Amino acid sequence: MADLMKFVQDEFVTRKDFPVFGAGDTITVFYEIKEGEKTRTQFFKGVVIQRRGSGNTETFTIRKMSGAVGVERIFPVNLPALQKIEINKKGAVRRARIFYFRELTGKKAKIRDKRR
């Protein structure tokens, strides 16, 4: 049964080629919003908190600061409304899920750049 589900996912789900990113990276996600009959592109720029799942059900969480309020948004990787993902900065973190980042404020909330 699992083989059948994997086959269907591989054959019929259209995957877009997004860059490889992980926790700690600062990315910008461009996605389409429909308002009535109009469609427009909006972007969400923030730090990747986590990637979870695999295959068709994979999602990633982004956190940004809007004023003094933290805003998190969860995006499915296979969302048809996703247009593109840009990596602004690669971050050096030691965890795959950086939930501790939610409590940090000020200079402590800064993520070091990954050395190349």
Curated annotation (Swiss-Prot):
Function per UniProt: This protein is located at the 30S-50S ribosomal subunit interface and may play a role in the structure and function of the aminoacyl-tRNA binding site.
Gene Ontology cellular component annotations, sorted alphabetically: cytosolic large ribosomal subunit
InterPro entries the record matches: Ribosomal_bL19, Ribosomal_bL19_sf, Translation_prot_SH3-like_sf
Gene name for this UniProt entry: rplS
Entry's family note: Belongs to the bacterial ribosomal protein bL19 family.
Name of the protein: Large ribosomal subunit protein bL19
SUPFAM superfamilies membership: Translation proteins SH3-like domain
Keyword entries, A-Z: Ribonucleoprotein, Ribosomal protein
Domain of life where this protein originates: Bacteria
Biological process terms in GO annotation: translation
